[in-house]
């Protein structure tokens, strides 16, 4: 897949949600494994794309995290005022919460907005987008 940027509920650049991480390990990356009580999570950082990829136990990509750049339909989302995103996607978030983070040793109350119908989570501080997470929406049967 030769795309650039975010395709909602599908991909970022050539990283496709649901595909196996082994398809991308030729790219310059680092890997970390987090062993939690109930699950193990593998996280990869890809230097050239400047993204984090989180995978299921079987190596399938479940989440893509963009914090330095995230193009959507030619618009840079990182740094974009949140209201402009709402005007662009024409969807309101399903959920909102405030999460306290330490960033460079200083505290930030970031607003986290979930757009569950399109597989998007947006972290906002001072009304500007700081981080975008992309995930595949799984239809419940």
What is each stretch, according to the model?
Residues 1-141:
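Short helix/turn-capping signatures at newly exposed starts of structured segments
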């Amino acid at each position: 897949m030769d795309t650039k940027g975010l395709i909602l509920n599908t991909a970022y650049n050539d990283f496709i949600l649901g595909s196996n991480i082994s398809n991308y390990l030729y790219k310059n990356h680092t890997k970390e494994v987090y062993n939690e009580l109930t699950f193990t999570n593998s996280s990869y950082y890809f230097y050239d794309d400047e993204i984090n990829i989180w995978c299921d136990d079987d190596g399938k990509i479940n989440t893509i995290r963009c914090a330095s750049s995230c193009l959507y339909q030619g618009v840079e989302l990182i740094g974009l005022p949140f209201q402009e995103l709402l005007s662009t996607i024409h969807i309101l978030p399903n959920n909102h919460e405030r999460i306290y983070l330490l960033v460079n040793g200083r505290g930030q109350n970031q607003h986290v907005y979930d757009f569950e119908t399109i597989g998007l989570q947006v972290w906002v501080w001072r009304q500007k987008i700081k981080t975008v997470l992309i995930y595949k929406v799984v239809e419940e049967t």
